[in-house]
Structure formats: structure tokens, C-alpha cells
Amino acid sequence: KGGMVYLDGANLNALMGIAKPGHMGVDVLHMNLHKTFSTPHGGGGPGAGPVAVKRALSDYLPLPRVTRRGERFELEGNGPKSVGRVRSFFGSFGILVRAYAYILSLGGDGLEDASRMALLNANYIRKKLEKSYHLAYNEPCMHECIFTDRVQQRSGVTTLDIAKRLLETLPESQAQVA
């Protein structure tokens, strides 16, 4: 009692259009846009990670903030309780626009469909590979499943060997990106 809940929204593919973190008691949520909303990351950067908070925490968000006043959106630069600026200028604005365009292009139904496909794909691959790889958790999964190389280690095969082989099977153009 009295604590707050932080959700690492590194991958929201299983939740979009299906669940509302705020309704689950989440007070703070950060979103890594590259995993869920089709934006570049790493070598393809820059990355961006918007933060959503419950109203009680909004005074502490970094500046500047986009606020809605009636039908208009404005930049708010003052906030005595704010942590201040965490990045120069307006952050990775272009990445935010790209993620927003992706969200608009899919719409609510499309986001939900993407989540349902992520759930289906993860559980499909889990079932297809569970006899060949050690499944770390033997239960239905959300957007991803976790295997270990325990079975392959008996033959001297490591996770790195498996990763390299996966790259070798990619078409030339995709292998260079990976």
C-alpha cells in the first residue's frame, strides 16, 4: 500500500488495443517505440521512449510538455516540480512523429489485430520449437517465448552458434541489417 507501479513497456505488442495499463494499476509506463511502433533503433537510431503517467505524477514529467488546451495543443515550458529537460531541444521528435503516423495508419482495430498476431505468432513458434529446444517457461506466452540451449549444449552447440546459423539463413539484404 502506498507504492507505485512502473511498467517497462519495452514491448507492448501483446497489449495494444487489448489491455489498458492504467486499468491494471500501472502508474508509470515507458514505451520503447522501436519494438512496437516501427521506428529505427540502435545503428538505425535515434531511439525514443515516451513516458505516460497517471495524472498525480504529471507535474514531475520532463519539459517541455505538450499540453491540450481545448482544441489546441501547446508547448508548456514551466513546471516547478518537473525534473527539467532531459535532452536538448524537443527530443527525438521525428521518431515520435513516425510512431504516431504508424499508430494512425493502423487505427484502433489495426493495433488490436497486430497484438493478436503477436500473441498467435509467439505461441505458434513456441509449439513448433518446444521439442527441439528447452522451453524456459512451459506455459502460453504473450508476445515472445524463451528457449535455452540446454538441449543443444549436449552436442557442443551454443546459443552463439544458433544465432550465427540464423543469420546465415537470412537473405543477403536482411543479414546485413541484422
Across the structure, where does each feature detected by a protein language model lie?
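Conserved PLP cofactor-binding pocket of PLP-dependent enzymes
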Residues: E168-A178
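Conserved PLP-binding catalytic core of the aspartate aminotransferase-like
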Residues: H134-R165
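Internal glycine-rich alpha/beta core junctions
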Residues: G44-P46, V53-I95, R150
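A glycine-rich phosphate-binding loop feature that marks nucleotide/adenosyl-phosphate handling sites
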Residues: N11-G17, R65-G79, M117-N123, N138-T148
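Active-site lining segments that contact anionic ligands and/or coordinate catalytic metals
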Residues: G2-M4, V26, T36, G43-A48, ...
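Conserved PLP-enzyme active-site core in the AAT-like
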Residues: K1-G70, V157
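Flexible, glycine-rich loop/tail regions that form catalytic "lids" or insertion modules at the edges
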Residues: L119, Y124-R126, D161-A163
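Structural signature of PLP-dependent enzymes
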Residues: S82-V83, I95-N123, Q153-G156
